[in-house]
Regions:
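Histidine-centered metal-chelating micro-motifs
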Residues: 116-129
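Active-site region of the double-stranded beta-helix
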Residues: 1-113, 133-137, 142-177
Length: 177
C-alpha cells in the first residue's frame, strides 16, 4: 500500500498526516494510519467532549488557557464531531488554528485536505481545543519522552502570545482521578 506524504508541516510545531482510504463501501469508510509516522506509541487516550466543550476549561479570569506537554508528542485523530485546535510556540510567533473533523481539516480557515488526518504536535507546543456544537470524540496516540511525568503533563497555563510570557495556573494532577 502506498501512503500519501505529509500535507502540511511547521518543524517543532505540527504535522498533518493524511490517512489512506483502504476501502469505501456504502455507509462505510475504512482508513489506514501510516505507521511510518507513528513508529512508537506509549499511550492511547480516548477523549470525548460534550457540545461546545473547552479543553482546558476556564480557570479564574483566564477564559481560554492552554496545555503544554514538555515531554509528550500528541497525535490527534478525530473520530466524530469537530475539534477547533489552536497551537502556539514562541519560536513560531503566531497561533495556528485548525478545524478537524473525521473527513477534512482546515488550517487558519482554509481547507488543506479533504479526508481523514492525524494532527501531530511536537513537545513544548501550547495547545487548546474548542469542540463544535455536536460534541466530539477522538483518539490521541501519545509519544512520551524521557522525563515524562503524568503529574505535570497536563498542567494548565496562562499564556500571553504578545509577550510569550506564561505561567502554570493549575497543576494538571489536580484534575486526575
Amino acid at each position: 500500500m502506498e501512503y500519501k506524504e505529509i500535507i502540511a508541516e511547521v518543524p517543532n510545531l505540527f504535522q498533518v498526516i493524511p490517512l489512506t482510504v483502504f476501502r469505501k463501501t456504502e455507509g462505510v469508510v475504512f482508513d489506514l494510519v501510516n505507521m511510518d509516522h507513528l513508529p512508537k506509541i506509549d499511550g492511547i487516550d480516548r477523549v470525548i467532549h460534550d457540545e461546545n466543550a473547552l479543553s482546558p476549561g476556564s480557570i479564574g479570569e483566564v477564559k481560554r488557557p492552554w496545555y503544554m506537554h514538555p515531554h509528550q508528542e500528541d497525535n490527534l485523530l478525530v473520530l466524530n464531531g469537530t475539534r477547533h485546535v489552536d497551537l502556539y510556540t514562541p519560536e513560531h510567533g503566531k497561533i495556528e488554528s485548525f478545524e478537524i473533523s473525521p473527513h477534512k481539516i482546515k488550517r487558519n480557515g482554509e481547507l488543506i485536505y479533504d479526508g481523514g488526518v492525524v494532527l501531530s504536535t511536537s513537545v513544548n507546543v501550547f495547545h487548546r481545543i474548542r469542540t463544535g456544537s455536536k460534541g466530539s470524540a477522538s483518539l490521541n496516540f501519545a509519544v512520551r519522552h524521557p522525563k515524562f511525568d503524568m503529574k505535570t503533563n497536563f498542567n494548565i497555563y496562562k499564556l500571553d502570545t504578545n509577550t510569550d510570557q506564561y505561567e502554570v495556573i493549575r497543576k494538571g494532577f489536580k484534575d486526575q482521578n
